[in-house]
């Protein structure tokens, strides 16, 4: 058995296969960077929206909750197929890279919004009350009080998600 492996190893470890693996690795890392960047920006918006208590934002909050709960429960490969079968009739001839990138962004946004929301909720309520006492508006409170304190809670699970997500995006890299 080991002899056969040694005999067929040169068929696998050749230049065209090496180039193919490097190209797939580049696509995987590229989709991970794009997906996590978009996911972090949109996820921050969704996390803030989910924490909102305004009655005007209640319908958007419900949509955000449904989006996050749906996309976190569907496997990535299934989302790839769903996006393929939704985008292809709407935009015929769209590249598979675009379809894969849209899928990656949808999944990353759902997962990272939960990571960010958990970090935002880790800030003690007394800190937020203190910011209200100082007449901070909602944006100042978020940028100057809540986000700086929540980074220490957000970064470890976000880094773990990025490592896990590299494995998921390899499904779409070929």
Language model features with spans:
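Transmembrane alpha-helices and adjacent helix-loop boundaries
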Residues: 1-174
């Amino acid at each position: 058995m080991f002899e056969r492996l040694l005999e067929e190893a040169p068929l696998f470890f050749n230049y065209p296969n090496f180039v193919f693996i490097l190209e797939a690795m580049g696509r995987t890392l590229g989709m991970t960077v794009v997906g996590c960047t978009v996911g972090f920006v949109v996820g921050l918006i969704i996390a803030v929206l989910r924490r909102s208590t305004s009655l005007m934002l209640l319908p958007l909050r419900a949509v955000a909750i449904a989006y996050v709960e749906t996309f976190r429960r569907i496997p990535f490969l299934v989302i790839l197929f769903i996006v393929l079968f939704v985008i292809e009739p709407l935009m015929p001839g769209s590249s598979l890279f675009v379809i894969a990138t849209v899928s990656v962004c949808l999944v990353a946004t759902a997962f990272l919004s939960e990571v960010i929301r958990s970090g935002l909720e880790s800030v003690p309520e007394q800190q937020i009350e203190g910011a209200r006492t100082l007449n901070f508006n909602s944006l100042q409170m978020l940028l100057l009080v809540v986000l700086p304190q929540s980074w220490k809670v957000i970064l470890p699970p976000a880094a773990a998600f990025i490592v896990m997500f590299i494995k998921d995006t390899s499904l779409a890299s070929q």
